[in-house]
Amino acid sequence: MILADYFRSEHDTAWDIAISSGVRHGVIRLPEDGKFDYADKSHWDTLVKKFTDFGVTPVAIEPMPNELHDHIKIGDGKRDESIKRVISMFPHMRSHGINTICFNFMAHIGWLRTADSIEERGGAKVTGFDLEDFKPIDKRITKEQLWDNYEYFIKAVIPYAEK
């Protein structure tokens, strides 16, 4: 068993706390700045080096990037392209010893928050939800569509994930 923590793609105080607590393995978030190319080995090399130089060995990716995940879950016109982009990540993940990618099939939106920096005791920042601040999206998906899209995704990626 290994002790791992969640690391955002950019260094923040959580990185320092994890290292000072003895954490040496990371569940990492990929950059979602539009510049990170999931299919580009050099981008993966640079990202992984940033973590290893800090003393953290990446062991898993979480979440699957939302710009891919959302199209796959709702099964829109970018679904197949998004699945290909996910599959293109696998060889680079493997080459760095990252054998796990976390995904969810919650109906379109994963974890829903309306605030991400509410101050609590001792100045700690927490997330929150306030119905008055919630702006509903105009997308609907049935349970059957979601299950169909899940099956489509799994059948597409498993042959590549098992390599």
Language-model-detected regions and their locations in the chain:
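N-terminal ordered "arm"
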Residues: 12-35
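Active-site beta-loop-alpha junctions enriched in small/polar residues
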Residues: 6-10, 29-33, 63-66, 105-108
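Aromatic-lined substrate-binding rim segments of carbohydrate-active enzymes
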Residues: 38-55, 77
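Short, acidic/polar
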Residues: 7-20, 40, 47, 81-91, ...
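Glycine-rich, proline-tolerant flexible connector loops at the mouths of alpha/beta enzymes
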Residues: 29-46, 107-112
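Conserved, mostly hydrophobic/aromatic
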Residues: 18, 26, 51, 93, ...
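Conserved beta-strand positions in the central sheet of alpha/beta enzyme cores
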Residues: 26-27, 60, 102
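Active-site acidic/histidine proton-transfer and metal-coordination neighborhood
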Residues: 72-163
